Amino acid sequence: MDQAKLARMQASVRIGGKGTPRRKVKKVHKSSGTDDKKLQTALKKLNVQPIQAIEEVNMFKSDGNVIHFSAPKVHASVPSNTFAIYGNGEDKELTELVPGILNQLGPDSLASLRKLAESYQSMQKEKGEDGDKKDDDDEDDDDIPELVAGDNFESKTEVE
């Protein structure tokens, strides 16, 4: 680009200095405060009460994983059978939490935990079988000869 043309462009886009309007970068802030306010108003309509001293909440999913909340905020409305649990949830595998949650479970929960463990084991076996199939494919690749540098089939046909 020509230096004179560049200097003219810079002069027309002057930032700062005496008497020039300042250019400001427009920043768009997406506030999560509005979502929190909406949540609080919805909870007030349900007449929920906060429940204190809950250290952790575990939600078991059908695929064998667990949504784990450590130190969540819990609000409950017993008459409407509504519980609000919010905080930072982490998606963890069942095996990570098993030793710590066994003493917290009742007899009915232990039965459901056994079912989850069985489904988890079957999922792991399926993954293992898929891995075995992939290993078998690697064995089939051993039949294919490797290319060697320097060997040229065209030169061999010309010699014969």
Swiss-Prot record:
It is found in: Cytoplasm; Nucleus. Residues 135-145 have a biased composition (Acidic residues). Keywords: Cytoplasm, Nucleus, Protein transport, Repressor, Transcription, Transcription regulation, Transport. It comes from the Eukaryota. CDD domains: NAC_BTF3. GO terms for biological process: protein transport. Coiled coil: none annotated. Residues 20-30 have a biased composition (Basic residues). Residues 33-98 form the NAC-A/B domain. Residues 16-36, 118-160 are annotated as: Disordered. PROSITE patterns: NAC_AB. One of its GO terms (cellular component) is cytosol. Residues 124-134 have a biased composition (Basic and acidic residues). PANTHER family: TRANSCRIPTION FACTOR BTF3 FAMILY MEMBER (PTHR10351). Belongs to the NAC-beta family. Part of the nascent polypeptide-associated complex (NAC), consisting of EGD2 and EGD1. NAC associates with ribosomes via EGD1. Component of the nascent polypeptide-associated complex (NAC), a dynamic component of the ribosomal exit tunnel, protecting the emerging polypeptides from interaction with other cytoplasmic proteins to ensure appropriate nascent protein targeting. The NAC complex also promotes mitochondrial protein import by enhancing productive ribosome interactions with the outer mitochondrial membrane and blocks the inappropriate interaction of ribosomes translating non-secretory nascent polypeptides with translocation sites in the membrane of the endoplasmic reticulum. This is Nascent polypeptide-associated complex subunit beta. It comes from Phaeosphaeria nodorum (strain SN15 / ATCC MYA-4574 / FGSC 10173) (Glume blotch fungus). The gene is EGD1.
